[in-house]
Amino acid sequence: MSESWQQPPQTQPQQPQPPQPQHHAEPPPALAEHTLPPGTAENPLGCAVYGILLQPDPGLQPPQHAPLQAAGEPGPKCGVCGHDLAHLSSPHEHQCLAGHDRSFQCTQCLKIFHQATDLLEHQCVQAEQKPFVCGVCKMGFSLLTSLAQHHSSHSGLVKCSICEKTYKPAEAAEPATTAAPSLPAAPAPSTVTPAEQADKPYSCPICQKPFKHLSELSRHERIHTGEKPYKCTLCDKSFSQSSHLVHHKRTHSSERPYKCAVCEKTFKHRSHLVRHMYAHSGEHHLFRCNVCELHFKESSELLQHPCTPSGERPFRCGECQKAFKRPSDLRQHERTHSAERPFKCDLCPMGFKQQYALMRHRRTHKTEEPFKCGLCEKGFGQPSHLLYHQHVHTLETLFKCPVCQKGFDQSAELLRHKCLPGAAERPFKCPVCNKAYKRASALQKHQLAHCAAAEKPLRCTLCERRFFSSSEFVQHRCDPAREKPLKCPDCEKRFKYASDLQRHRRVHTGEKPYKCPNCDKAFKQREHLNKHQGVHAREQQFKCVWCGERFLDVALLQEHSAQHSAAAAAAEGAYQVAACLP
């Protein structure tokens, strides 16, 4: 088998074929001329450009191209299940399920499947869902084989992810290798059959794709024109198809229409269900690069990834020299070294380095409460908050103590509730809070809780905490380095916050940074300055009308005014005596 790309088989309606000469099936001219560099691993069953892989069974021999058979001759059959393999280009396309454990069953038609991905394809066909997306035009398909057939319809240049050369998958391209002069390439056969042309009379004038209905053609043409007539009424986004708008509106609501047939978990979007189904089957990635062995969930990710052999990481951080496989991973990592916060909240001025952090923050705003209570219409930002709120509507508590029959809303409250057998027999009751105990020693220990903090006899010299009993003091494992990691270099006193340490250091340095604007006094702490400025404010209240002096309270002003009155009376009496003298 030559080292050339093999295009995925085209699934056409089975019609009698005329006898063909016995020779090996030749690929299209453009793909045959595109050869890989020497030493590249051969992949006869897949294309790394489109991401379609048909992985063979390791226990079987490599596929051999059998001669094409004339119509009417019996073809090869599977030796286990008897399935006809004549229409398949390779026997490995038939995966016999005989002898395997079929554990995935369709809930609608009860059909059984060996793998969860087969069940997903089956359900997508029934529900007309299209989880397999083309990496070139973003068109969706229900089956992986349909996506492989669709890739051959693109006429634009496609880059090979291994040798980075470009070629046209549907037309003859320039030879990628300087080989011997080749014969003129035969024109590529038309991919539209006469029967399909009669069934689909409407064709796109740009890409020649046929359609059965005019509405389908109009919807398809928006891909080329970029028209987006469907606008969201809740935000300023617009879409080219109504289904895309319906898909987008689920981001504003709590609707989850896609349900897993295996575990009945629900999802908002079909792509989330597709990723979830891989977890049941163990096939977490369908598309694999044959050079760097990276796996991808979608063919578009395989097309866009920069291929690096042997797991190389060419993108290196300039700060910490950490290497990454993708430039997007490097850009995301570089934000940890800088103050860049490209993800801004549109409701407040806060910014975030990662998108998931922004999404988590937006739920804190009261304007976005997607989780609604079905009884009172109250909204919540988190589903756990809604679940906690719904306990209010229940007629009885969910968790009940089997001993004292006390009910609790949460299981954690029931675990914290320490109920002893025979709880009704508690003769020792506290006169302050009416709490009862079985033993007098327990009541005495409880009564210490009503005492003031100064009455606690035992004090820890490291963290200044006080305790009632010696058992509590022994159980208290004080770690000042953990609780108060900041230590004063002058007196070894520890603090929990840097601001507390900075304020304490002024005791040793004598620094007084807070100065009064009304006088020449200065203070070490801001609260001392605020208390001092109240003195100046009160001085403006009581003013003497004789001399203009100000006082803090009215009693001092009255005492001061009495001195002025006495002096004035004495002066007036002396004037009268002087006037009477001859």
UniProtKB/Swiss-Prot annotation:
The keyword rRNA-binding does not apply. A zinc finger (C2H2-type) spans 76-100, 104-126, 132-154, 202-224, 230-252, 258-280, 287-309, 315-337, 343-365, 371-393, 399-421, 428-450, 458-480, 486-508, 514-536, 542-564. Pfam families: zf-C2H2, zf-H2C2_2. GO terms for biological process: regulation of transcription by RNA polymerase II. Residues 1-39, 174-198 are annotated as: Disordered. One of its GO terms (molecular function) is DNA binding. The modification Phosphoserine is found at S281. GO terms for cellular component: nucleus. It is found in: Nucleus. The keyword Transcription applies. Residues 1-14, 174-196 have a biased composition (Low complexity). Keywords: DNA-binding, Isopeptide bond, Metal-binding, Nucleus, Phosphoprotein, Repeat, Transcription, Transcription regulation, Ubl conjugation, Zinc, Zinc-finger. There is a cross-link at K130 (Glycyl lysine isopeptide (Lys-Gly) (interchain with G-Cter in SUMO2)). Its main location: nucleus. Belongs to the krueppel C2H2-type zinc-finger protein family. May be involved in transcriptional regulation. This is Zinc finger protein 319. It comes from Homo sapiens. The gene is ZNF319.
